From Swiss-Prot:
UniProt keyword list: Cytoplasm
Subcellular localization(s) per the UniProt record: Cytoplasm
Species: Prosthecochloris aestuarii (strain DSM 271 / SK 413)
CC terms in the record's Gene Ontology section: cytoplasm
Protein name: Regulatory protein RecX
Amino acid sequence: MSDSDTRKALNRAIGYLGIREHSRQEIRGKLKRNGFSDETIEKVLERLDTLNLLDDLSFARNFIRSRTRVKPSGLYKLRYELRQKGVPDDIAEEALREYDSAAQCLNAALKKMPFLKGDQEHRRKKLHTHLVNRGFDSQTIRQTLDELLTN
């Protein structure tokens, strides 16, 4: 391992971060796939930390914000997706504390409602399935459906 390798790996990592924010684990994986040694990767990650270019909490918050803007999702699904991105559980939980699951569930239900046909019970079942698939918990779904379908 040489300074040249470290410089190349750092430039590559900065390039990735220039495109979009990445988690620490994503950068580690990308550099590993590019053939850099573990020692070089750790040096690069330390350097990115000192430059404040790598922040898993910021990444998690931004990921949640952008993900739910496009497609409202529940806590279960977001937690799973953050885990897939390599965000540590404690950081994911901190980012998810700011998340309003009830509002997102209502938003997802309102988006789906115009496309549902049939009687109220049929619509309730379809909507329930849709919200479960989006990763919302049963209590939030129940409250949302009661609010929407009793009016």
